[in-house]
Amino acid sequence: MGVKSFVEGGIASVIAGCSTHPLDLIKVRLQLHGEAPSTTTVTLLRPALAFPNSSPAAFLETTSSVPKVGPISLGINIVKSEGAAALFSGVSATLLRQTLYSTTRMGLYEVLKNKWTDPESGKLNLSRKIGAGLVAGGIGAAVGNPADVAMVRMQADGRLPLAQRRNYAGVGDAIRSMVKGEGVTSLWRGSALTINRAMIVTAAQLASYDQFKEGILENGVMNDGLGTHVVASFAAGFVASVASNPVDVIKTRVMNMKVGAYDGAWDCAVKTVKAEGAMALYKGFVPTVCRQGPFTVVLFVTLEQVRKLLRDF
């Protein structure tokens, strides 16, 4: 069961991640919308996750207001200004991220779930499911953080002025450029946030899916089939979205920032709330739900089918 659970989770995660990539890109762009790009006022700050002796770097702040934009209009604008292919910017990083991060978290969750299940009743209570999700999500995020940073930057590149774009050729080029220009530690920029978010998402998503599915089956609402998998997975996606969105906004901004933009995650959160209001932490919530819902549905429906195919192995 050990290795097979990783294979099953990896296949399902890659399919789900790549098929919902455009929704994730729109979510990232919305989370960055309103963030200060540049101006003439220079402030000296240390980069996020900087070491104590790090030297400060200049950051250009802005006070200009930015009009609100919705996910549909943003998607249309991306297609008009950058072309339809832009909706798949960073998909190579998504592929790598799902291979590293999701394969690890999905496989490890199943391993822990099986290990912690009561041998007599054959059941696992909700608190242990959440614990398994927290552990699996944290380890998976630590493994996949370099691909996560590359993915965010590649997705966000099109919103920058032409002169400021990074123009990465692919995930390999993105990682090489970051290491060369910003050091190896840049690959783990925002890693504390990534790990926190992954722990929340994995615990909320996987534990709630199992809980919703068990509740539906035990109460005889539906049989164990496609309908049950879709309902349980969409509900799990909504729970994960509500729980993770604030951390996701800060994570996205820290990962995408130019050197010196924020003095760490807390500084990013404070500046975001101060400049844009508390609800800025739920920027991109609609596309988060619109992405997390389909992603979770595809993830678990695919996972259930892959399990059937690999049942005899």
UniProtKB/Swiss-Prot annotation:
Pfam families the UniProt entry points to: Mito_carr
GO terms assigned for molecular function: dicarboxylic acid transmembrane transporter activity
Keyword Disulfide bond on entry: no
Solcar repeat locations: 4-115, 124-215, 224-309
GO cellular component term, pick one: mitochondrial inner membrane
Spans through the membrane: 6-26, 84-104, 130-150, 189-209, 230-250, 282-302
Membrane topology reported for the UniProt record: Multi-pass membrane protein
GO process annotations (BP): cellular response to hypoxia; mitochondrial transport
Induction, as annotated: By cold stress.
Coiled coil: none
Keyword annotations from UniProtKB, A to Z: Membrane, Mitochondrion, Mitochondrion inner membrane, Repeat, Stress response, Transmembrane, Transmembrane helix, Transport
Organs and tissues of expression: Expressed in roots, leaves, stems and flowers.
Taxonomy, superkingdom: Eukaryota
The keyword Membrane is annotated on this UniProt entry: yes
Annotated compartments: Mitochondrion inner membrane
Record-stated family: Belongs to the mitochondrial carrier (TC 2.A.29) family.
Function: PUMPS are mitochondrial transporter proteins that create proton leaks across the inner mitochondrial membrane, thus uncoupling oxidative phosphorylation. This leads to a decrease in the efficiency of oxidative phosphorylation and an increase in heat production. May be involved in protecting plant cells against oxidative stress damage. Recombinant PUMP4, reconstituted into liposomes, transports a wide range of dicarboxylic acids including malate, oxaloacetate and succinate as well as phosphate, sulfate and thiosulfate.
Protein name, per record: Mitochondrial uncoupling protein 4
Species, as recorded: Arabidopsis thaliana (Mouse-ear cress)
Gene name of the record: PUMP4
